[in-house]
Design a protein with these regions (language model features):
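Short, Lys/Arg-rich flexible segments
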Residues: 1-197
């Protein structure tokens, strides 16, 4: 009687590779190595923009603001409204994200020796989709049906003075765009993704 011996070594390797790829996650966010020219981390500013903040004006801030054309008394309240560009961007692209996720699930249902590479490709596609969504939200000032609060007149005065190179003179403001989240493109350019095990 003839016998057939089947070695399943490669099948186990494939199963392990597929299992490893299927457990990976995609994270979209601000590159931790990105900084503005003044040395402030882009991630720190992104957090303030995304979640907003409120604070009481201190003496030194009152002087600085006054020198830049915004006169606020000590004890006044500064408020920056939340502009939730991360959540709004991802919510606006939910259907596209769901399509890519379904494609990845279909790959898992038809395992071949290319499956790990296909899963990796799907993860990269999800990351690129997330980056594009967040960058678009930053550049456009809205995502889906969520529009972000416009810049305040005080912010325009400060930006106008800072970006025109003026410190305390009374020359006209050069920045008039009230669209939030974008001045020079640093924030949008620092959005990236990584795939984690």
């Amino acid at each position: 009687m003839a016998t057939v011996t089947v070695k399943l070594d490669n099948l186990k390797k494939l199963k392990d590779a597929v299992s490893k790829q299927a457990q990976r996650t995609v994270k979209v966010g601000v590159d931790s190595g990105a900084f503005y020219p003044n040395g402030i981390a882009v991630a720190e500013i992104a957090s303030y923009l995304n979640y907003g903040w409120t604070q009481t004006v201190k003496k030194q801030q009152s002087k600085w603001l006054g020198a830049h054309g915004v006169h606020m008394k000590v004890g006044a309240t500064l408020n920056m409204p939340a502009r939730p560009f991360f959540r709004a961007a991802i919510d606006a692209k939910k259907q596209d994200i769901a399509k890519v996720t379904e494609m990845a699930k279909a790959v898992l249902n038809n395992i071949t020796e290319n499956t790990p590479q296909k899963i990796q490709k799907a993860l990269k596609l999800l990351g690129a989709l997330g980056v594009e969504a967040v960058r678009d939200a930053i550049n456009d000032g809205y995502a889906g049906n969520v529009s972000f609060a416009l810049r305040s007149p005080a912010t325009l005065v400060i930006y106008g003075n800072l970006f025109s190179g003026h410190k305390t003179d009374d020359t006209p403001n050069q920045i008039t765009n009230r669209k939030p989240l974008r001045v020079e493109g640093t924030l949008a350019g620092s959005i990236s993704f990584e795939i984690e095990d």
